[in-house]
Amino acid sequence: MNESTINTVLFDLDGTLINTNELIIASFQHTLDHYYPGQYSREEILHFIGPSLFDTFSAMDPDLTDDMIQMYRTFNHEQHDLLVTEYETVLDTLKVLQDRGFKLGIVTTKIRDTVLMGLKLTGLEPFFEVIVTLDDVQNEKPHPEPVQLALSKLGSDPHEAVMVGDNYHDILSGQAAGTKTAGVAWSIKGEEALFKHRPDFMLKKMSDLLAIVGAD
């Protein structure tokens, strides 16, 4: 496929469009310090970024999963507006893509309420025709279902789309759904961690996407 045939761009949210890393780390630290005082360092918490809260907390203690998720989300919402920012060139890139008629969507493992908080805070909400959240699917990334659902809602074929994300779940989900994939070099887990999963492209900044899809 020639990448100039791409007319649809799907984005992960956290760590891709908006910088929620410090919010996520603080939310995990707050929750884990309550249930497991002193047991988890910042470096260990980095491994929890990407999978759903259910997967992370149920692996620790199935009986406490719901309580831990509730504590995490309460803290996360309280601190949200203090700790969330957008990444460099994101807004300008989205403006160009929208002006050129690209179909834009978000595919995330967050719940819808929290997604909308971040989009409204950063002014990104108007750019997206479709937002697929954890509430909308039976299977989260890296399963292809979330990407497939977004493509279906946008009326796009996989070969016309690229999935952009900061985590291996994003790359694997896009690959399984048949799209091109792009990793972001500003991933908190590091560029090398994404290269292991062979994304088609690696973005040093979001505006690099414009040349890839023929919108530069």
UniProtKB/Swiss-Prot annotation:
The active site is at D12 (nucleophile). It comes from the Bacteria. One of its GO terms (molecular function) is phosphoglycolate phosphatase activity. CDD domains: HAD_PPase (cd02616). Hydrolyzes pyrophosphate formed during P-Ser-HPr dephosphorylation by HPrK/P. Might play a role in controlling the intracellular pyrophosphate pool. This is Pyrophosphatase PpaX. InterPro entries: HAD-like_hydrolase_sf, HAD-like_sf, HAD-SF_hydro_IA, HAD_2, HAD_sf, PGP-like_dom2, Pyrophosphatase_Ppax. The keyword Cell membrane does not apply.
